[in-house]
Amino acid sequence: TESFGDPAHEPIILIMGAMSSAVWWPDEFCSQLAKMGRYVIRYDHRDTGKSTSYEPGQAPYSVEELADDVVRVIDGYGLEAAHLLGMSLGGFLAQLVALKYPKRVKSLTLIASERLADADPDMPAFDPAIIEYHQRAESLDWSD
């Protein structure tokens, strides 16, 4: 983990998406949030950056455990609760934390995140071309 700002300020935990290290939250962004009165914490979730890593396809953990790790970060900094800002998978994890540990979450900010609720029936469907594009990622070699 890495922190920016004064620990006495409002804490915000930055949760990045899948296969992305905490440094994808730029230092300048973190510093600006800190200058605005936030205590900023970013961390590498499992299999990213400086955290524990496993052989591709051999990860012995679940998405729920990744969400529990967010609470471990909150605990590790001695905080009662924190604002959560999640990008992509990080947003999904932030939602799980809010559902499982509502008293530990001051607010949620989600960027490009999947939803945990049922879809709104009035929303238009995804264009099939978008689905096809993202399905091609299944065949990519992500090991490098």
Where are these regions (language model features)?
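Conserved HGGG/HGGXW glycine-rich cap/lid loop of the alpha/beta-hydrolase fold
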Residues: 2-53, 59
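Structural signature of beta-strand start/N-cap positions in the alpha/beta core
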Residues: 11, 39, 80-83, 104-107
